């Protein structure tokens, strides 16, 4: 039993050391005719808030990805943090700021444009940014 406990501890220690960050990928389906309007709401309201959290050091990076050609998930954003706990803290702070600054009519408008969304949470196993530690 003692050996099993040590193996479990070792397994989690190896996985924790292998993790190089935490990624949240939010994907949204927006009707083609409303893409530009949805992108503008992000540009005007959401992107500046997530960018602030990067500048404040709460998150490592924030990216918004869009396309008009490919699959139906055409408005996507990604947040990278150092770990899951940091993500939860940044997510809470980000949405607190979003809900306090985005006018309700703009929030409702974005929700009307969003046909469906999904969130994926990943442990970042490898990331290279070219910076020397």
Task: Label every model-predicted segment.
Residues 17-19:
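Boundary of Sec targeting at the N-terminus
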Residues 132-133:
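Short, solvent-exposed mixed-charge patches
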Residues 24-58, 63:
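N-terminal targeting signals for Sec/Tat export/insertion, comprising classic cleavable signal peptides
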Residues 45-48, 52-60, 80-125:
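An amphipathic, aromatic/His-enriched active-site/gating alpha helix that lines ligand/cofactor pockets
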